[in-house]
Swiss-Prot record:
GO terms for molecular function: DNA binding; DNA-directed DNA polymerase activity; metal ion binding; RNA-directed DNA polymerase activity; RNA-DNA hybrid ribonuclease activity. Activated by host HSP70 and HSP40 in vitro to be able to bind the epsilon loop of the pgRNA. Because deletion of the RNase H region renders the protein partly chaperone-independent, the chaperones may be needed indirectly to relieve occlusion of the RNA-binding site by this domain. Inhibited by several reverse-transcriptase inhibitors: Lamivudine, Adefovir and Entecavir. PANTHER family: PEPTIDASE A2 DOMAIN-CONTAINING PROTEIN-RELATED, POL PROTEIN. The lineage of its organism: Viruses, Riboviria, Pararnavirae, Artverviricota, Revtraviricetes. Pfam families: DNA_pol_viral_C, DNA_pol_viral_N, RVT_1. Keywords: DNA replication, DNA-binding, DNA-directed DNA polymerase, Endonuclease, Host-virus interaction, Hydrolase, Inhibition of host innate immune response by virus, Inhibition of host RLR pathway by virus, Magnesium, Metal-binding, Multifunctional enzyme, Nuclease, Nucleotidyltransferase, RNA-directed DNA polymerase, Transferase, Viral immunoevasion. InterPro entries: DNA/RNA_pol_sf, DNApol_viral_C, DNApol_viral_N, HBV_DPOL, Rev_trsase/Diguanyl_cyclase, RT_dom, Viral_Replic_Matur_Polypro. Residues 178-346 are annotated as: Spacer. Residues 357-600 form the Reverse transcriptase domain. This is Protein P. Residues 202-221, 285-310 are annotated as: Disordered.
């Protein structure tokens, strides 16, 4: 007969009417009993032939992704002037006095942040914006492009101008100026009103005035290039800027000039009123030319290309309009849904390209992307705004993956010890926290996003408009992209974006100037940064508490008035160093703090209500006697594991599920096991703060017997059969707790000290977790353990009781930015008897 839930409860000693613990508990360590119970509860992981269940409630397997919904009314969030001040360290020192070396080290990590991947794979520009919403391709393209443009305008992205230069908006940092040394500019020596392009010292090139015209000739430069006589740009180009090119060494070509090896001089075919657009025809005629940035009507950063003589069309002979968008203007509409109807709505569509306020040199950056982007809801509670998801997962995959640095995440007990108090709390919201931390420009070529332009994007997604070589550039080919869907989408977008449609329809490559969210390095850097800032705040206000995890900052003070004045001072300090706070989202919690999914009060911590609700939903939908895919089990265990410390039996209760996931087997919930878990999770107990104290109760065991020292009293007992030493020590600790009721027990066993009971026989682990819940352990060496003699059967000998103080730990999540010291480097030669040599294992 299967084991019923009441019997199972009784077996686990969860009921009060159980017999004496010393007799009942050792039984749970019996292998035979554990095996029989596992068989009864169907925990044996048989190979199931019934088809697996791949969805339980909202939980799906990791490989069956939920289909996200596209919202055509998504708003792009604004990124106000986010600029972390470069003299951050100086300002912190003014605020609190000299910084500790740990604070300094952490702040230097992010000023600027650096990123060194082992290998970077470059993908074609078509993969820049992921076709994540097949029914809203065009809409998603423009919304994403608008989001990227917003980020660039906010100084969060660089725009690739040419292979070795980029432009950006916002305030420059000193390391962005240092990138150009001793460079000269090819300039007309007469310099009619045109200022020199770049001085010797500064690497930032300020924008030239819009009216500056291209000078007629180049003088003989260090390269010995002689420009042909005559105007570079034809007369039609009224608002042209200046052709700019940087020369680094006498042997190197100017940046952006790509030599084809044909030995021809430059042919600079400047197009009228629009842009210099290298379309697929250029790749077809000469594959050695890489696709590259295009030239704008304002001509601010013209890239010079050497084009083979055969492929040059002179302006006189029927020039082809090279801007795909504006080409429609002079064509006959092909249908009612021809794009030319939209293009003719406006006379002035604005420039093809925009340029930043500052120019810098960058390492060689190809016209490729290293990660795709798409939009999703900002969060489950805010579906009106969008969030940009950047997929740089290439750096976390394969043999060349980057192993990201590890950092301390506060565990539940440490967090409770730290924050469970009678303080009054508030939490601060840092807006776009990741985008505060600057990246060194050398990282830009590794973190590229962008889009290939609307024409290529649409062509790639629609099967009708395949580009054939022979008809490239013909009207037939141009109108291939016209379709009702595209027409309707663009017409709707025109109402919100206006002339920006033209700008966004051009290709663009952008590199990150601040740390992106999709790289494993970013959480580490953010955690280091906020913990250092909190450490500074904490030292400035020693009577208050400031704590952070990632971008979540909390402040605590004794009274509400005190908290408000602290809030004002801290806010002013954070704003003064350039940290942008969203003051409308400041939450005042009173005496119970909501943080990291927990509710923390003076009584301890519990999961937040929304998590309790998720647990209820999970159990309501959990099927019985049906094999559930192990990937779904992973999701279920993720939720249950979060709340496990608040249940009677804790993690050991989930061990059968963990075992099935490890074995990659389906798991079948028996009615009894489900009822057991359900009962566990419907009654949650707070995790209380550990209190300091003196240890008065000691436990010890040998494989055959156990001994206790409770104050001046000694006890001993024997086991029916010899047990593994860890099991015996765990039983002794349970007896000590049940006999004395002490919250503080001394033991010499490291496994018991760790309070992880998942490796013990399953039933014993569950029961011990409940008995020892809320108990703190102190390590006592065997030689000094007063319970050592009783465990060996000697009751007459009395060792003096130790005075063992217990101090609750806050783990590595200290309030101050302290971290373990880095071990000093050993000399190259290692002495043979050294522990380093002995402990070494082959990699």
């Amino acid at each position: 007969m299967p084991l019923s839930y009441p019997h199972f409860r009784k077996l686990l000693l969860l009921d009060d009417e159980a017999g004496p613990l010393e007799e009942e508990l050792p039984r749970l360590a019996d292998e035979g009993l554990n095996r029989r119970v596992a068989e009864d509860l169907n925990l044996q992981l048989p190979n199931v032939s019934i088809p697996w269940t791949h969805k339980v409630g909202n939980f799906t397997g990791l490989y069956s992704s939920t289909v996200p919904t596209f919202n055509p009314d998504w708003l792009t969030p604004s990124f106000p002037d986010i600029h972390l001040h470069q003299d951050l360290i100086h300002k912190c020192e003014q605020f609190v006095g000299p910084l500790t070396k740990n604070e300094l080290r952490r702040l230097k990590l992010v000023m600027p942040s650096r990123f060194f991947p082992k290998v970077t794979k470059y993908f074609p520009m078509e993969k820049g914006i992921k076709p994540y919403y097949p029914d809203n391709v065009v809409n998603h393209y423009f919304k994403t492009r608008h989001y990227l443009h917003t980020l660039w305008k906010a100084g969060i992205l660089y725009k690739r101008e040419s292979t070795r230069s980029a432009s950006f908006c916002g305030s420059p940092y000193s390391w962005e100026q240092e990138l150009q040394h001793g460079s000269t500019s090819i300039n007309d020596s007469k310099g009619h009103g045109t200022e020199s392009l770049c001085t010797q010292s500064s690497g930032i090139l300020s924008r030239p005035s819009a009216g500056s015209s291209i000078q007629g000739k180049f003088q003989q430069s260090r390269l010995g290039l002689q420009q042909k006589q005559g105007q570079l740009a034809n007369g039609k180009q009224g608002r042209s800027g200046r052709i700019r090119s940087w020369v680094h060494t006498p042997t190197r070509w100017p940046v952006g000039v790509e030599s084809t090896g044909t030995g021809c001089a430059y042919n600079i075919a400047s197009r009228s009123a629009s842009c210099f657009h290298q379309s697929a025809v250029r790749e077809k005629t000469n594959p050695s030319l890489s696709t590259s940035k295009r030239h704008s009507s304002t001509g601010h950063a013209v890239e010079l290309h050497s084009v083979p003589p055969g492929s040059v069309r002179s302006e006189g002979k029927g020039s082809v309009f090279s801007c795909w968008w504006l080409q429609f203007r002079d064509t006959e509409p092909c249908s009612d849904y021809c794009l030319s109807h939209i293009i003719n709505l406006l006379e002035d569509w604005g420039p093809c390209y925009e340029h930043g306020q500052h120019h810098i040199r960058t390492p060689r950056t190809p016209a490729r992307v290293t990660g795709g982007v798409f939009l999703v809801d900002k969060n489950p509670h805010n579906t009106t705004e969008s969030r940009l998801v950047v997929d740089f997962s290439q750096f976390s995959r394969g043999n060349t993956r980057v192993s990201w640095p590890k950092f301390a995440v506060p565990n539940l007990q440490s967090l409770t010890n730290l924050l469970s108090s009678n303080l009054s709390w508030l939490s601060l919201d840092v807006s776009a926290a990741f985008y505060h931390l600057p990246l060194h420009p050398a990282a830009m070529p590794h973190l590229l996003v962008g889009s290939c332009g609307l024409s290529r994007y649409v062509a790639r997604l629609s099967s009708t408009s395949r580009i054939h070589d022979h008809q490239h550039g013909t009207m037939q080919n141009l109108h291939n992209s016209c379709s009702r869907n595209l027409y309707v989408s663009l017409l709707l977008l025109f109402q919100t974006l206006g002339r920006k449609l033209h700008l966004y329809s051009h290709p663009i490559i952008l590199g990150f100037r601040k740390i992106p969210m999709g790289v494993g390095l970013s959480p580490f850097l953010l955690a280091q940064f906020t913990s250092a800032i909190c450490s500074v705040v904490r030292r400035a206000f020693p009577h208050c508490l400031a704590f952070s995890y990632m971008d979540d900052l909390v402040l605590g003070a004794k009274s509400v008035q005190h908290l408000e004045s602290l809030y004002t001072a801290v806010t002013n300090f954070l704003l003064s160093v350039g940290i942008h706070l969203n003051t409308s989202k400041t939450k005042r919690w009173g005496y119970t703090l909501n943080f990291m999914g927990y509710v923390i009060g003076s009584w301890g911590s519990l999961p937040q209500d929304h998590i309790v609700q998720k647990l209820k939903d999970c159990f309501r939908k959990l099927p019985v006697n049906r094999p559930i895919d192990w990937k779904v089990c992973q999701r279920i265990v993720g939720l249950l594991g979060f709340a496990a410390p608040f249940t009677q039996c804790g993690y050991p209760a989930l061990m059968p599920l963990y075992a099935c996931i490890t074995a990659k087997q389906a798991f079948v919930f028996s009615p009894t096991y489900k009822a057991f878990l359900c009962q566990q999770y419907m009654n949650l107990y707070p995790v209380a703060r550990q209190r300091p104290g003196l240890c008065q109760v000691f436990a010890d065991a040998t494989p055959t017997g156990w001994g206790l020292a409770i104050g001046h009293q000694r006890m001993r007992g024997t086991f029916v059969a010899p047990l593994p030493i860890h099991t015996a020590e765990l039983l002794a600790a349970c007896f000590a707790r049940s006999r004395s009721g002490a919250k503080l027990i001394g033991t010499d066993n490291s496994v018991v000290l760790s309070r992880k009971y998942t490796s013990f026989p399953w039933l014993l682990g569950c029961a011990a977790n409940w008995i020892l819940r809320g108990t703190s352990f102190v390590y006592v060496p065997s030689a000094l353990n007063p319970a050592d003699d009783p465990s060996r059967g000697r009751l007459g000998l009395y060792r003096p009781l130790l005075r063992l103080p217990f101090q609750p730990t806050t783990g590595r999540t200290s309030l101050y930015a302290a971290s373990p010291s880095v071990p000093s480097h050993l000399p190259d030669r290692v002495h043979f008897a050294s522990p380093l040599h002995v402990a070494w294992r082959p990699p």
